[in-house]
Amino acid sequence: IAKIETKKAIKNLPEIIVQAAGQQPFGVMIARGDMAVEVGYERMAEIQEEMLWLCEAAHIPVIWATQVLEQFVTEGIPSRAEMTDAAMSERAECVMLNKGPFVAEAVTLLDNVLTRMQGHQSKKTPQLRALHSW
């Protein structure tokens, strides 16, 4: 698993994918916590979207990580932003939750959200769109 969390790793993601092409299994973790600090919060959606496009075109599975349903896992009540973020995680092959007293409930909630989102997301399209983040 290539954990992508720095500007350098984002810029080098195409090369990382090419280098790992012969090594199976291989996947990419979008480590959004450190990445937000590196690229700035205002660019997070753009950067993670382009990383998803690139991995999708290369048929590389993605782990959507860092602070997914974090408030819900720890306090039992999700924020509106967390719910939208969880819904957008449907584009990834895997979603990573942190530990907490409500993690089982978070798994159930996430399953319900992702099941409903399947019909709304375009996933595994055959064409790589233009990348603009680097």
Identify the residue ranges that each predicted region occupies.
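Conserved alpha/beta-domain cores
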Residues: 1-66, 70-90, 97-134
